[in-house]
Every structure is written in structure tokens, then in C-alpha cells.
Amino acid sequence: SMNGVVDERMSFKAGQNLTVKGVPSIDSTNFAINVGNSAEDLALHINPRFDAHGDQQAVVVNSFQGGNWGTEQREGGFPFKQGEDFKIQITFNSEEFRIILPDGSEIHFPNNRYMHFEGEARIYSIEIK
């Protein structure tokens, strides 16, 4: 079960491919995958929203640092279903994160925090709400 907060604390290096698998609950409103050093320092926040924060079936990507969210990036398409398995792949370099969604579509998001990783990113938490 992936209800609540799952703190994976896994690290991965530039060029490595990280695969995240999960199942949103049947009544899930949204879930998030956070890559960063802590809850206050997230280089990558992937937030698929079934029905949350005024969005329906939207994938929102952002970063969070110094108590502030960055600029939200929204992507078309929503290849997630409540109660169904998903797989997301994440890889990064000094320039950007590349996120491959379950349907094979890609999101590119700038890696603004590369120096703080010293070449290594960390899955801070996976939350399903």
C-alpha cells in the first residue's frame, strides 16, 4: 500500500534511470513524487491530479526551494487512472529532468538545483492522497 507518505530515500546519479511504480487508490484525488534533498528543497515535484487544487486530470510539475514554489509546468494528456498501476521513469543531467509517463509521453523540466545534488538526486518522498 502506498497511502500516506512513503519516504524512499533512494539516490540516483545523473544519467541513471529511476523507475517509480505505484497504484493510486480508487478514490485518490492526486499523488506526488518528490525528488530533492528535503521537504524544503525539491528539485522536482511531479503531481498528477485526478481532482485537486482546482484541476481535473492534469499533470503539474514544479520545484520548491526556500519556502517558495517555482513556476508550474503543465502538460497535456493524463495517462493515469485511479486504482490502476502506473510506471514513471525519471532521468536527469545537469540541464534537465526527463520524465517518461506511463503512455510513453515525455516531460522535460529544468534542473535548477543541480549543484545542490553534487551529481546525485534523491527521491525524497512519494505521496498518494
Swiss-Prot record:
Modified residue annotations for N-acetylserine: 1
Function, as annotated: This protein binds beta-galactoside. Its physiological function is not yet known.
Organism in which the protein naturally occurs: Electrophorus electricus
Domain (Galectin) ranges: 4-129
Entry GO MF terms: carbohydrate binding; galactoside binding; laminin binding
GO cellular component terms, A-Z: extracellular space
Key words, A-Z: Acetylation, Lectin
Residue numbers binding a beta-D-galactoside: 69-75
InterPro entries: ConA-like_dom_sf, Galectin-like, Galectin_CRD
UniProt xrefs under SUPFAM superfamilies: Concanavalin A-like lectins/glucanases (SSF49899)
Name of a matching Pfam family: Gal-bind_lectin
Descriptive protein name: Beta-galactoside-binding lectin
Keyword Iron-sulfur (UniProt): no
Keyword Zinc attributed: no
SMART domains the record matches: Gal-bind_lectin, GLECT
